[in-house]
Design a protein with these regions (language model features):
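N-terminal Sec-pathway targeting helices
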Residues: 7-20
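Hydrophobic alpha-helical membrane-insertion segments, chiefly the h-region
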Residues: 23-32
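Ser/Thr/Pro/Gly-rich low-complexity linker/stalk segments immediately outside membranes or between
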Residues: 34-44
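A post-motif C-terminal structural segment
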Residues: 42-48, 53-182, 187-189, 230, ...
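General structural concept
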Residues: 199-207, 227
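Glycine-rich anion/phosphate-binding loops
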Residues: 204-212, 255
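Anion (oxyanion) recognition and catalysis
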Residues: 219
Length: 554
């Protein structure tokens, strides 16, 4: 997974053994290196914690550190909790690209015809044969040329000459990293299974065959498992740890269907702890609500029938989970419940949260940590190409912005609260645990080109990292625990040389509202003259920070 040289490409695959619980799956990236390292003896680690800042590339981590007063221009950096970990590397994130009958390659295609929506049910594309050559294409979705499907390869690849040997050294083609960029489903699949696949894939290979995830491997070895996220629990990154479906938007389905993420999480994989967003009371509204009108519900991430089963039977439901949801004093209730549950007795915890107007996510933290943007549309800034974000919340009659924010903060835990609760439950397992914690809203802020929200969500994620590091120090230390902090993919953010000074002078909120890229000190995309020229991912290597028992094999 480490980028050590640009002179030669090779594949590095880790063997799935008992020791895989240490490796976590993150070490199975296709890498750039010019030498082989000797085999490293693998020893058993009790607890493995993987923390993913969704979309948190090198520039985003640097912006977060700068907001705390630390300025650097290369390397690991300092100022954030995850930057205190002993080890640092870079990992590529690309996936596959496949052309169907029309000959146009796309990163979103499997090797099946997709004539049947059920995972794995469609026939294979006629004449398809996997070709391992690199094929970045010339469009964001991949391909773009009418070519014979077997004329070029099915791996996107990464060229350090075009993209840069590292994130702080630009390559010679600023458009290149837009081409065939990965999505969170594809990259999460690789993180959890060690297999490259296509955008949209939730732990299935290019033939839509299910892959064994590290969560399942850990469970098979008697360990408790957990999924924690600031976005919906059946979104791509958490979903790929505990489901196998061909499309990431298969969030939930009515019982007893299983070709969806949430039902597989709850009925097949059954992690000990599932905590995150996706509550139906988070539907966005473009205007305040009149007297007598109930807050909008949006059953996108959970069906009405699934929610009814859980909410009406929080302690005894068909899924055998203790169910918590957003409500008064949510963080306190979560902590109290977590303290009572014991995985050795078969207890499991499911918590579903989300702020009104946040499209399923927890209250969003701004750079100063005041959650002042809670309830505002997450996708307003980039969509308006540089104008100020939306200022309208789905207020109830008589509710003010101040009381709205206070209510949402009270009725929803933070990512840090969720992490503490997960550790409280999982740490009771005498055999140890595997836990994934995702700062998913970092990615949402970056899609919006919203610097203020992006820095805030990075710092929010870092609080959870600090909590985890402190927990490790007090629970067996680094001799019993392994912590890996990384991103699943990057975004196309560039900080100008004057960014640090402008950030100190004007603050992130002002730089977010500024439409001129020079005055804003940053821009999104390949054109330095356009501040909001891109609102999507980039095919750049991402940082990996890690420390603990078993880290030598990474």
């Amino acid at each position: 997974m480490v980028i050590k040289s640009s002179s030669q490409f090779r594949f590095k695959r880790r063997l799935f053994t008992t020791a895989l619980i240490i490796v976590v799956g993150i070490g199975i990236f296709i890498t750039l290196t010019n030498h082989s390292s000797p085999a490293t003896p693998v020893t058993k680690t009790k607890n493995v914690i993987l923390m993913i800042g969704d979309g948190m590339g090198w520039e985003m981590a640097r912006a977060g550190a700068m907001a705390k007063g630390y300025n650097y221009t290369s390397g690991k950096g300092e100022g954030l909790s995850f930057q205190t970990l002993d080890n640092y590397a870079l990992a590529t994130t690309y996936g596959t690209t496949i052309a169907p009958g029309n000959g146009v390659f796309s990163t979103g295609n499997s090797a099946l015809s997709n004539s049947i929506s059920i995972t794995g049910a469609s026939p294979m594309l006629p004449g398809f044969k996997f070709q391992p050559q690199f094929n970045p294409g010339d469009k964001p979705s991949g391909g773009g040329k009418n070519l014979n499907p077997n004329a070029v390869g099915n791996l996107v690849g990464y060229d350090p000459q075009r993209g840069g040997i590292n994130p702080w050294t630009p390559g010679n083609d600023p458009e290149y990293i837009k081409y065939s960029y990965p999505d969170s489903a594809n990259t999460a699949t690789t993180l959890y299974t060690g297999v490259k696949s296509y955008n949209n894939a939730i732990s299935v290979d290019i033939f839509e065959k299910p892959l064994e995830t590290i969560l399942k491997t850990a469970a098979d070895h008697g360990k408790s498992t957990g999924i924690v996220t600031s976005v919906p629990v059946d979104h791509a990154t958490p979903g790929a740890a505990a489901a196998n479906v061909n499309r990431r938007n298969k969030y939930d389905g009515d019982y007893p269907t299983l070709d969806n993420i949430l039902q597989q999480e709850l009925r097949i994989y059954q992690p000990t702890v599932i905590l995150g967003g996706g509550h139906p009371l988070t539907g966005a509204s473009s205007q305040p609500l009149p007297t007598g009108v109930e807050p909008p519900t949006k059953f996108e991430y959970i069906t009405k029938t699934t929610y009814a089963e859980l909410s009406k039977n929080p302690n005894q439901n068909r899924y055998n989970y203790t169910f918590l949801e957003r409500g008064k004093d949510a963080a306190d209730k979560l902590g109290t419940t977590a303290a009572k549950l014991d995985p050795n007795m078969g207890d499991r915890l499911l918590g579903l949260y989300g702020a009104r107007g946040q499209e399923g996510n927890l209250p969003v933290s701004t750079a100063n940590g005041d959650y002042s943007n809670t309830g505002l549309s997450i996708f307003s800034l980039f969509g308006s190409q540089g104008k100020n974000p939306d200022t309208v919340r789905p207020l109830l009659a008589g509710e003010t912005d101040k009381s709205f924010i206070a209510k949402e903060i009270n009725e929803n835990p933070t990512l840090d609260d969720l992490t503490k609760a997960a550790l409280a439950v999982l740490s009771k397992d005498k055999d140890g645990f595997w836990l994934m914690v995702e700062g998913g809203d970092i990615d949402w802020a970056a899609h919006d080109d919203n610097l203020d929200n992006m820095i805030g969500t990075v710092l929010d994620f870092d609080k959870a990292v600090k909590t985890t590091i402190d927990w490790i120090k007090n629970n067996g230390g680094w001799e019993n625990n392994l912590l890996i902090v990384t991103a699943d993919h990057d975004h196309y953010l560039t900080l100008n040389p004057n960014f640090y000074e402008l950030l100190k002078e004007k603050g992130p909120e002002a730089l977010t509202a500024e439409s001129d890229s020079i005055k804003a000190g940053h821009f999104w995309g390949s054109n330095p003259n356009i501040k909001s020229g891109w609102g999507n991912h980039a095919n750049l290597p991402v940082p990996v920070y890690y420390q603990g028992k078993g880290s030598a094999v990474l």
